[in-house]
């Protein structure tokens, strides 16, 4: 008997209010880290009806023009007209940034040059063989649909689309392998004059059919395109947005556990971010090396402590090696102290705006060093000893 089930993941466009907040926070981080690699940044953003508030803590000598940074992000996303409910020119931008607590900093920057973890916490990474990027298929497709919504809007293929939008994909699995797409949900902000019939047909033809691989298409896919009907009021006018509210969208679409820490606006001394990238790096290289077909990796840290307090590897019964053997391999091959992660992944660069929409993982951009599979040979060599 086939073991059959549905699994669902969602994504959001760059114009979703929570993603707007993430992008502003990461733009602030990029501006500062480009000018001060030793800066400590924890930037949180709120966007709401007609205003944006930037808050958090900094330790840096760099002056960051918060208004200019925020307005440029909002402009790039596409909120360029008050008719969209938010306009980069007229929105108020409030600055509530403060200084980082010296109590925190004393445990992070050490006299011996090492870096203590910026906080306690647990982080997860995941990889599997469902896609070429070693990501689960549902979140992979959801991101592609959300990205296509934005691209078709920006290139005027679908000029009636507006910036806010969401996608959701339900995939049918048989014996733990994806076999077909069952349901597609897309909600997209739009101009008031377009009919729901035209919008649905255009989204299916220009986005869904051009994104989904042919092997997963069939005549019985269920489509829910703007299922509540009109979606004219969107963005911060429709919902407030906050940094760090899309942590499942940012990671694996619910396919593996999440430690709870968000990424955007945090410099890499914060292990919430850097160790999550490292955990993905470990998991992806384990799968790419062939020692397993899927891997969940957990790392855990204590504030001010250099080494991780625990490393856990679960290959979901797809490896001939034990968890203890895999843990020894990970410790031997990867540098998992905060400093080791920052140096091996070259994280003191202004790369974070690129991560802040459409997923931090599974996108093989040159800047995303944690997506490289350059540890495969070392892993293979470890198990040949």
Swiss-Prot record:
Binding residue positions for Mg(2+): 18
EC main group: transferase
UniProt cross-references to Pfam families, sorted A to Z: S-AdoMet_synt_C (PF02773), S-AdoMet_synt_M (PF02772), S-AdoMet_synt_N (PF00438)
Entry keywords, A to Z: ATP-binding, Cytoplasm, Magnesium, Metal-binding, Nucleotide-binding, One-carbon metabolism, Potassium, Transferase
Transmembrane segments: none
Protein residues bound to ATP: 16, 164-166, 230-231, 239, 245-246, 262, 266
Function (record text): Catalyzes the formation of S-adenosylmethionine (AdoMet) from methionine and ATP. The overall synthetic reaction is composed of two sequential steps, AdoMet formation and the subsequent tripolyphosphate hydrolysis which occurs prior to release of AdoMet from the enzyme.
Known partners and oligomeric status: Homotetramer; dimer of dimers.
Protein name as it appears in the record: S-adenosylmethionine synthase
Organism field: Helicobacter pylori (strain J99 / ATCC 700824)
Biological classification of the source: Bacteria, Pseudomonadati, Campylobacterota, Epsilonproteobacteria, Campylobacterales
Gene encoding the protein: metK
